Amino acid sequence: MKKLYRRLLDICYENKLHHLGSYFSCLHIIDEIYRTKNEDDIFILSNGHAVVALYVVLEKYYGLDAQELLDKYGEHPKRNELDRIHCSTGSLGMGICVAVGRAVGNPNRHVHVMISDGESNEGSVWEALRYINDSGLKNITVHVNANGWAAYDPVNIMLLEQRMRAFCPGRLKFHRTTVNYFGLDNSLHAHYTNFTEEQYKEAIASL
């Protein structure tokens, strides 16, 4: 993980990227998915604003250059199966719906999808969770990156987990994470800032 964090740090600093809290809070989850999934399984990042974390994981496991992916696709994923990007996302709540469709369309292929806690404000997320449960869909896993922050406000993680497990008890993995990485505040500031030179050097030194 140390090399992944360093790679993500470098790209974020060199490109003056925001959404740092989203990137760093989900990096270890995406890495674990790719480390353990079957080769044929697919991954969809529904909270597309965290895509730079996906880019560095794709670099690790498939040799794709993370900086080139950022230059090519930008800060939200655009579907290109050749580059292992299985869904264009950005508008929150849409990726999980596509993931459900992919799982229904091919029962022999497992689909992993990540959503964020802030994304749970979208009604389509709850429709998808209910459909997964009511239809008995088995070849999908919904990973929730619960870092405690939505776009404008904190999220009640305990209440959110209770509600989500009530909707979809069988296919949910709820990951309680934090945005407090490398000196970032555990606040909205972690989502809407970029690294200064001083912060970057301190972050590198802490690895």
Can you say where each PLM-predicted feature lies in the sequence?
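Short, structured coil/loop segments at alpha-helix boundaries
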Residues: M1-K2, E197
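Phosphate/pyrophosphate-binding active-site segments
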Residues: L8-L9, S22-D31, E197, E202-L207
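Cofactor-binding active-site loop characterized by glycine-rich and histidine/acidic residues
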Residues: I11-S135
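Glycine-rich ThDP/TPP pyrophosphate-binding loop and its adjacent helix/strand module
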Residues: K78-L207
